[in-house]
């Protein structure tokens, strides 16, 4: 078996990636989220495949086809709710994974980090298009509002929006193409994940100390396979509790009403995992400015390697930057809350303050904190 494992052209790749991979001996449970994201992707592809067998991407029948899946298809309700809540679990793991990367300075592995940002954008695009497919009220109006943001692009904006819509409004053509893209993107994401892993295995994993761990590596299997398996069990337990006991807790009641272009819902908002970016978008009164802030709220992650001023890689031994980091986490939670609130006082001013704080902490305060810590520790 050992000979096949190390000699066979295909199994050899798997062996070097998941079995004999030299791994730092001290990586914590925060490093589990990569494998959990892989699990989430597999769950989403499988449940999505079975949903696609029964779904029809036509404005006249899309809503009723989802109802048909839940009522008439064997375990259709389970597949549908696993897919809907699987997206939420996916984003929880994504945010934890990115948060770990920021805390432990993993952004210094630039190729891996940049590929991660591309993956984040791809997953967000996939989730957005998936939310449109049930063709409920929030699906329709969410698609209308978010795609309409592109009209803020000077000169070509309006043409671009109509090109994406396939007409003069969100209609059958839009739904059909969104379904096509929603189906193909997870497979593109899978390919990007392999590139992400390829870049990671060029440098090897980071660790909580941020120090070089070449002298203290252990094989991935069995140590981290068993550790990842525990993470998988915990994730599946939380996932099935969410899916079986509280399937609609993260959804919007408006999406149980069929799409009606003549009736606007009182509060148009995306799924919970986009609310922080939506709050940043809404906090700027200018349309183009809002769109730029929305894109920058994610793209700012690409600046992290340039904004790293500390002589230490991680935040493990840096209490000032640690404080900034946890304020940033709290700020993101505030933005998520604000994104789900109506556009009125005091939510507008809180959203604007939280948006300013978000960019200020990342661009100004964390780099300054890094320099202060260098001086305190006399590392310059």
From Swiss-Prot:
Residues that bind heme b b566: 97, 196
PANTHER family: CYTOCHROME B
Chain positions recorded as a ubiquinone binding sites: 201
UniProt KW keywords: Electron transport, Heme, Iron, Membrane, Metal-binding, Mitochondrion, Mitochondrion inner membrane, Respiratory chain, Transmembrane, Transmembrane helix, Transport, Ubiquinone
Range of residues in the leader sequence: none
Record function comment: Component of the ubiquinol-cytochrome c reductase complex (complex III or cytochrome b-c1 complex) that is part of the mitochondrial respiratory chain. The b-c1 complex mediates electron transfer from ubiquinol to cytochrome c. Contributes to the generation of a proton gradient across the mitochondrial membrane that is then used for ATP synthesis.
Other comment: Heme 1 (or BL or b562) is low-potential and absorbs at about 562 nm, and heme 2 (or BH or b566) is high-potential and absorbs at about 566 nm.
Cofactor(s) required for function per UniProt: heme b
Family in the record: Belongs to the cytochrome b family.
Membrane topology reported for the UniProt record: Multi-pass membrane protein
rRNA processing found in the keyword field: no
CDD domains in UniProt: cytochrome_b_C, Cytochrome_b_N
Keyword Iron in record: yes
Biological process, per Gene Ontology: mitochondrial electron transport, ubiquinol to cytochrome c
GO molecular function ontology, one term from the record: metal ion binding
UniProt-recorded name of the protein: Cytochrome b
Any GO CC annotation of this UniProt entry: respiratory chain complex III
Organism field: Microtus californicus (California vole)
Gene3D superfamilies named in the record: Cytochrome Bc1 Complex, Chain C
UniProt subcellular location: Mitochondrion inner membrane
Family matches, as InterPro entries: Cyt_b/b6_C, Cyt_b/b6_C_sf, Cyt_b/b6_N, Cytb/b6-like_sf, Cytochrome_b, Cytochrome_b_C_euk/bac, Cytochrome_b_N_euk/bac, Di-haem_cyt_TM
Pfam families found in the cross-reference section: Cytochrom_B_C (PF00032), Cytochrome_B (PF00033)
Subunit structure: The cytochrome bc1 complex contains 11 subunits: 3 respiratory subunits (MT-CYB, CYC1 and UQCRFS1), 2 core proteins (UQCRC1 and UQCRC2) and 6 low-molecular weight proteins (UQCRH/QCR6, UQCRB/QCR7, UQCRQ/QCR8, UQCR10/QCR9, UQCR11/QCR10 and a cleavage product of UQCRFS1). This cytochrome bc1 complex then forms a dimer.
Listed transmembrane segments: 33-53, 77-98, 113-133, 178-198, 226-246, 288-308, 320-340, 347-367
Annotated residues for binding of heme b b562: 83, 182
């Amino acid at each position: 078996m050992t000979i096949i494992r190390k000699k066979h052209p295909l199994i050899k790749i798997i062996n070097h990636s998941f079995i004999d991979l030299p791994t730092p001996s001290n990586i914590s449970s925060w490093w589990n989220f990569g494998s959990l994201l892989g699990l989430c992707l597999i769950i989403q592809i499988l449940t999505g495949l079975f949903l696609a067998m029964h779904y029809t991407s036509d404005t006249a029948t899309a809503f009723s086809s989802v109802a048909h899946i839940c009522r008439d298809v064997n375990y259709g309700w389970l597949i549908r709710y696993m897919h809907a809540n699987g997206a939420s679990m996916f984003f929880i793991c994504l945010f934890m994974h990115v948060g770990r990367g920021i805390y432990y300075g993993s952004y210094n592995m630039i190729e891996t980090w940049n590929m991660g940002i591309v993956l984040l954008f791809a997953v967000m695009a996939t989730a957005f298009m998936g939310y449109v497919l049930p063709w409920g009220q929030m699906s329709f109006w969410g698609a209308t509002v978010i795609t309409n943001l592109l009209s803020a692009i000077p000169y070509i904006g309006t043409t671009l929006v109509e090109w994406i819509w396939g007409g003069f409004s969100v209609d059958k053509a839009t739904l059909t193409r969104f379904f096509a893209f929603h189906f193909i993107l997870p497979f593109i994401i899978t390919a990007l994940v392999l590139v992400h892993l390829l870049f990671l295995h060029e440098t090897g994993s980071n660790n909580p100390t941020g120090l070089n761990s070449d002298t203290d590596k252990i094989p991935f299997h069995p140590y981290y396979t068993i550790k990842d398996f525990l993470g998988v069990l915990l994730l599946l337990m939380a996932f099935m509790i969410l899916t079986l006991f509280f399937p609609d807790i993260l959804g919007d009641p408006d999406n149980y009403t069929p799409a009606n272009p003549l009736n606007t819902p009182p509060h148009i908002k995306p799924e919970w995992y986009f609310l922080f970016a939506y709050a940043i978008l809404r906090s700027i009164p200018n349309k183009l400015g809002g769109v730029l802030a929305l894109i920058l709220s994610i793209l700012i992650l690409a600046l992290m390697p340039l904004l790293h001023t500390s002589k230490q890689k991680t935040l493990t031994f840096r209490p000032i930057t640690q404080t900034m980091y946890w304020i940033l986490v709290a700020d993101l939670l505030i933005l998520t809350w604000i994104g789900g609130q109506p556009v009125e006082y005091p939510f507008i001013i809180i959203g604007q303050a939280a948006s300013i704080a978000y960019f200020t902490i990342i661009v100004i305060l964390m780099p300054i904190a890094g320099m202060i810590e260098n001086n305190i520790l006399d590392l310059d």
